[in-house]
Amino acid sequence: MIEVGIVGGTGYTGVELLRLLARHPEARLRVITSRGNAGTRVDELFPSLRGEVELAFSEPDVDRLAACDLVFFATPNGTAMQMVPDLLARDTRVVDLGADFRLKDVETWSRWYGMTHACPELVAEAAYGLPELNREAIRGARLVANPGCYPTAVGLGWLPLLEAGLVETRGLVASCVSGASGAGRAANVATLLCEVNESFKAYGADGHRHLPEIRQSLAQVAGGAVELTFVPHLVPMTRGMHASLYATLRGDAGDLQVLFEQRYADEPFVDVLPAGAHPETRTVRGTNLCRLAVRRAPESDQVIVLSVIDNLTKGAAGQAVQNMNLMFGLPETAGLDAPAVLP
């Protein structure tokens, strides 16, 4: 049984981790921390977990966390990097759901996140936790940088085309929408019901923090730099993410439906829909699935890929558990096999 700790358990990502780990057949929650709610029982703050999690929140303590086999950080950016070196030194493995170890260029990270990195020597070691791309590196990792939600949806959508060299790496466009939970659980006027309901807006069009992460991931697949326009949008739903991806084909690309089906045939968490289908966010709610559809634009050399995930599950906590499974040699689907919640 894997002894697990969670640092930062009161945000939406943290409670999603709790939900998944509570029923995981090979993991046992040992420590769950929160500076603001130390001493409060988990099921008092989250009644949905009554009978599932019997722990109380505690102050972060390196000694208690180091007694775990693995620690998840579901914390604001800049938090994990303060504690990770001590945990790794004591043979505790780490999955960071924040952005502290995602970008391999430390100067780029500092520019986008507005702080100096506390342990730049560990950045190169961290495995980027997109299993469909980096499965073998994750298996042997001490430290995994869990991808962001947008980079997951976008990366899985473009992966087959870029691997095969079938699209131009200039002029890529990603138009994405996310539910309000992507903005976090902290009070924020911009995500109040009366502000979000019956509305639709773009944000971060002049530079979202996930942009350099998406570029880095796509460049790894393409074998060189990519030119990308990325525009995220906020929609009035709680959870879910939809990415509409556009690229220019290079010559005769063949049967794209077959390409996608073959690339993801053995991937337990990627579902390529039948030709002509359109993926819906409601069909992945609460699951670790990414559902994809690919098609050519009529009378054009453009290809369109549609990608949906649950931003809290495959876009965060579910993918983190998937990475844990790989790190400890467990079945990759352990604890992640529940179907979507409908309606």
UniProtKB/Swiss-Prot annotation:
Molecular functions (GO terms): N-acetyl-gamma-glutamyl-phosphate reductase activity; NAD binding; NADP+ binding
Keyword Cell membrane appears in the UniProt entry: no
Enzyme class: oxidoreductase
Pathway: Amino-acid biosynthesis; L-arginine biosynthesis; N(2)-acetyl-L-ornithine from L-glutamate: step 3/4
Compartments where found: Cytoplasm
Catalytic activity, reaction form: N-acetyl-L-glutamate 5-semialdehyde + phosphate + NADP(+) = N-acetyl-L-glutamyl 5-phosphate + NADPH + H(+)
Positions annotated as active site in the UniProt record: C149
GO biological process: L-arginine biosynthetic process
Gene3D superfamilies: Dihydrodipicolinate Reductase, domain 2, NAD(P)-binding Rossmann-like Domain
Pfam families membership: Semialdhyde_dh (PF01118), Semialdhyde_dhC_1 (PF22698)
Domain of life of the organism encoding this protein: Bacteria
Chief place where the protein resides: cytoplasm
Keyword terms of this UniProt record: Amino-acid biosynthesis, Arginine biosynthesis, Cytoplasm, NADP, Oxidoreductase
This protein's GO CC annotations: cytoplasm
EC number, as in UniProt: 1.2.1.38
Presence of the UniProt keyword Cytoplasm in the record: yes
Function per UniProt: Catalyzes the NADPH-dependent reduction of N-acetyl-5-glutamyl phosphate to yield N-acetyl-L-glutamate 5-semialdehyde.
The family this protein is said to belong to: Belongs to the NAGSA dehydrogenase family. Type 1 subfamily.
Name by which UniProt lists this protein: N-acetyl-gamma-glutamyl-phosphate reductase
Originating species: Alkalilimnicola ehrlichii (strain ATCC BAA-1101 / DSM 17681 / MLHE-1)
Lineage of the species this protein comes from: Bacteria, Pseudomonadati, Pseudomonadota, Gammaproteobacteria, Chromatiales
Gene name in the database record: argC
